[in-house]
């Protein structure tokens, strides 16, 4: 070997102690093509194998990483290297990639919030993850953290390799780029000249690499003495000041016509929230997280894609996790394997009616999910503790997600409910209880409720209450008739008619021997004539039996009396016949009334007929 190049160590991707995963944006999936599959990190320390949180994605270098192992930029390492070259008679090749530069590590730690294992690279537009890994192929990094389309963080597994890459792949941030380029060309020409001078000797002797030339030992000793006299290069004060300021250093080489600028990354170099949705690279070349779709992707489309991906993966794998996570084998899932799966066409517009019908059907099978969610949280914590040594935590998260989706309860399906739905259900129950209470109170107020103290303690009291109720009903029924008569008021001529009718039956009991006795006239003594005195006849027992007549009848009787005084005896007999006919008519009316008095519903009609009959008689 012409020079001692440090120690190369090959580290497998994903091997060793990997940091725990970070939370990524909703709907994002790792991709194998383009920008390589990400690995998450959650460490907040400056140790070589841990990454500061703030970036959501880590794109791992699957080709293998490079670890220096020792600090070759320290003064002690450079002196050891020179002594080894002197011992084995090696001549060191001078190149830009392997400069003996002493870098004070303690001085670099003075930079605020510095991450010595990470370099911030900007100007990576139109570059993919593989292009950046190819740029740092001499110092292969561990992974890349994309910040936006034009900048990213390149992370190594140790601080020494990152500082070597910064010093050897970038130049001083000054205007003397041309001078730096000329110096680089001069060094490369001198190294070529030295190789040409050494080629005849090596071809003639056919010595193997690593063997010592014994023909010219004096020449080798002179060369090593000259080399040892040359001290190792040190950074100039201006370059040290620029590194302390953490200024951007331009790269020596260009990639796809782009000049890269780099510096040590800080904890403030984080990915902004929603940077993936603003990425012009994804819009132009396609988003590998969503099947290589180009253009602007809506949030609803991303959610549907994510749900379709989970369903397709469940159907494809056909492995469902049981109730006990520890007994069943863990589900090994790699997101990169889903990229090559043929995508199903996703409809942008779905019928809302079908969704509403499905929701209505599922509402009948809703189960309260609060207790089961707490049980799942306990299982998740226990699974993370048990499977920390066997599987990655991102796989466990995905396993639990698959378990929640693919293993419903045997009787009823579980459904997640929002907090607003729970509040609404509580309000409904409160309203229902209030309505039932108010309805019960209203019914009781209408019907009336007896207290326990009012209930009789003996059967005799109950019988007495029944008797009182029946007596009150009878009184009310009897008072009903009188109430009707009171409302109708006193009928005209009714009292007199009743009096005459009550007196008239007494006349029947008398022995009737002749017409006069049948008409109600008293018998005359033998000494007097039949029509001796009209006044005595009118004032006799007939008027006493008939009672007092009304005023109109009195007037009529007075007129008839006057006529009787002036008229002959024939007129008196005609008057008696008229009075007899009137008495018969009234007797018939009384009989009819006595028959109809037993019908209470016809009392009004009877009163009307009697009143009309009295009017006609008058």
Curated annotation (Swiss-Prot):
Family: Belongs to the NCBP3 family.
Function: Associates with NCBP1/CBP80 to form an alternative cap-binding complex (CBC) which plays a key role in mRNA export. NCBP3 serves as adapter protein linking the capped RNAs (m7GpppG-capped RNA) to NCBP1/CBP80. Unlike the conventional CBC with NCBP2 which binds both small nuclear RNA (snRNA) and messenger (mRNA) and is involved in their export from the nucleus, the alternative CBC with NCBP3 does not bind snRNA and associates only with mRNA thereby playing a role in only mRNA export.
MF GO annotations: mRNA binding; RNA 7-methylguanosine cap binding; RNA cap binding
Region annotated RNA recognition motif (RRM) domain, chain positions: 117-178
Motif extent (WLDD motif): 146-149
GO biological process assignments: 7-methylguanosine mRNA capping; mRNA transport
Name of protein: Nuclear cap-binding protein subunit 3
Domain of life of the native organism: Eukaryota
Region Disordered, residue ranges: 1-53, 170-250, 342-366, 426-618
The species this protein was found in: Xenopus laevis
UniProt-annotated location(s): Nucleus; Cytoplasm
Stretches with biased composition (Low complexity): 469-481, 609-618
Main location per the UniProt record: nucleus
Biased composition regions of type Polar residues, renumbered to the chain: 231-240, 436-450
Chain intervals with Basic and acidic residues compositional bias: 174-188, 451-468, 507-517, 550-562, 583-596
InterPro entries: NCBP3
Gene (UniProt): ncbp3
Subunit structure: Component of an alternative cap-binding complex (CBC) composed of NCBP1/CBP80 and NCBP3.
PANTHER family the UniProt entry points to: NUCLEAR CAP-BINDING PROTEIN SUBUNIT 3
Pfam families: NCBP3 (PF10309)
Keywords: Cytoplasm, mRNA capping, mRNA processing, mRNA transport, Nucleus, RNA-binding, Transport
Keyword Transport: yes
Composition skew (Acidic residues), residue ranges: 20-29, 205-223, 344-365
């Amino acid at each position: 070997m012409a020079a001692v190049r440090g120690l190369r160590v090959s580290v497998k991707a994903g091997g060793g102690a990997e940091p725990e995963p970070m939370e990524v944006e909703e709907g994002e999936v790792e991709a194998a093509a383009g920008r390589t599959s990400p690995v998450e990190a959650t460490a907040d320390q400056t140790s070589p194998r841990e990454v500061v949180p703030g970036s959501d994605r880590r794109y791992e270098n699957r080709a293998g990483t490079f670890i220096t192992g020792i600090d070759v930029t320290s003064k002690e390492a450079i002196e050891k290297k020179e002594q080894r070259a002197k011992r084995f008679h090696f001549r060191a090749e001078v190149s830009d990639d392997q400069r003996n530069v002493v870098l004070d590590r303690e001085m670099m730690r003075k930079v605020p919030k510095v991450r010595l294992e990470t370099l911030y690279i900007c100007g990576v537009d139109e570059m993919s993850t593989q292009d950046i890994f190819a740029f740092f192929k001499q110092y292969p990094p561990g992974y890349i953290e994309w910040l936006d389309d034009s900048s990213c963080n390149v992370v190594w597994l140790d601080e020494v390799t990152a500082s070597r890459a910064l010093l050897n792949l970038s130049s001083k941030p000054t205007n003397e780029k041309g001078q730096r380029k000329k110096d680089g060309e001069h060094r490369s020409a001198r190294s070529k000249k030295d190789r040409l001078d050494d080629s005849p000797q090596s071809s003639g002797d056919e010595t193997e690499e690593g063997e010592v030339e014994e023909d010219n030992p004096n020449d080798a000793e002179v060369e090593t003495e000259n080399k040892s006299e040359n001290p190792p290069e040190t950074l100039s004060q201006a370059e040290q000041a620029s590194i302390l300021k953490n200024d951007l250093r331009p790269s020596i080489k260009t990639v796809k016509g782009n000049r890269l600028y780099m510096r040590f990354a800080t904890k403030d170099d984080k990915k902004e929230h929603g940077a993936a949705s603003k990425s012009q690279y994804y819009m132009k070349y396609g988003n590998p997280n969503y099947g290589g779709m180009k253009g602007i992707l809506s949030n609803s489309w991303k959610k549907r894609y994510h749900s379709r991906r989970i369903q397709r993966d469940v159907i494809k794998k056909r492995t469902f996790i049981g109730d006990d996570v520890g007994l069943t084998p863990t589900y090994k899932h790699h997101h990169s394997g889903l990229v090559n799966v043929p995508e199903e066409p996703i409809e942008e517009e779905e019928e809302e009616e079908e969704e509403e019908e499905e929701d209505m059907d599922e509402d009948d099978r809703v189960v309260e999910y609060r207790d089961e969610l707490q049980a799942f949280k306990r299982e998740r914590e226990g699974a993370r503790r048990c499977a920390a040594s066997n599987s990655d935590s991102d796989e466990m998260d995905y396993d639990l997600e698959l378990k929640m989706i693919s293993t419903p309860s045997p009787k009823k399906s579980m459904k997640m409910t929002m907090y607003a739905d729970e509040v609404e259900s509580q309000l409904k129950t409160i309203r229902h209880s209030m309505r039932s209470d108010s309805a019960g109170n209203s019914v009781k107020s209408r019907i009336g409720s007896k207290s326990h103290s009012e209930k009789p303690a003996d059967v005799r009291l109950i019988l007495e209450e029944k008797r009182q109720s029946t007596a009150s009903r009878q009184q009310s029924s009897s008072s009903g008739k009188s109430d009707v008569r009171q409302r109708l008021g006193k009928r005209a001529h009714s009292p007199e008619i009743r009096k005459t009718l009550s007196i008239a039956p007494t006349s029947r009991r008398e022995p009737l021997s002749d017409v006069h006795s049948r008409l109600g006239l008293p018998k005359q003594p033998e000494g007097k004539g039949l029509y001796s005195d009209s006044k005595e006849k009118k004032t006799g027992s007939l008027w006493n039996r008939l009672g007092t007549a009304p005023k109109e009848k009195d007037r009529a009787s007075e007129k008839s009396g006057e006529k009787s005084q002036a008229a002959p005896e024939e007129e008196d007999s005609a008057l008696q016949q008229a009075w007899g006919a009137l008495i018969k008519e009234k007797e018939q009316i009384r009989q009819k009334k006595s028959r109809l008095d037993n019908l209470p519903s016809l009392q009004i009609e009877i009163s009307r007929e009697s009143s009309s009959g009295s009017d006609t008689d008058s």
